[in-house]
Regions:
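Phosphate-coordinating loops and pocket residues in cytosolic domains that bind phosphorylated ligands
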Residues: 38, 67-68
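Residue-level signal for the short linker/turn that defines the boundary of a DNA-recognition helix
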Residues: 9, 19-20, 46-49
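Short, conserved catalytic or interaction motifs in soluble domains
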Residues: 41
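DNA major-groove recognition helix of helix-turn-helix/homeodomain DNA-binding modules
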Residues: 49-64
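Short alpha-helical DNA-recognition segment
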Residues: 19-38
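A short, Lys/Arg-rich alpha-helix, primarily the initiator
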Residues: 1-17
Length: 68
């Protein structure tokens, strides 16, 4: 992860690499598309539970999503 890459940027990048639209990821994890948009815009931070669901839905590890 680039030093200036935020969680939201990383989330959006991985989601797009997986060719998953926002609405589909949001539906898979049980949140609104608007809420997912707020995560990708770095306006909100997901809870640990939602973070784990995002990792599972995208098929990535927590360290990969965090960029470590």
């Amino acid at each position: 992860m680039a030093m200036n890459e935020t969680f939201g940027v990383r989330l959006r990048k991985i989601r797009k690499q997986k060719k998953m639209p926002q609405w589909k990821l949001a539906k898979k994890i049980g949140i609104s598309q608007q809420q997912l948009c707020l995560y990708e815009a770095d306006k909100h931070v997901p809870s640990l539970t939602i973070f784990e669901w995002i990792c599972g839905a995208l098929g990535v590890s927590a360290t990969e999503l965090l960029g470590y």
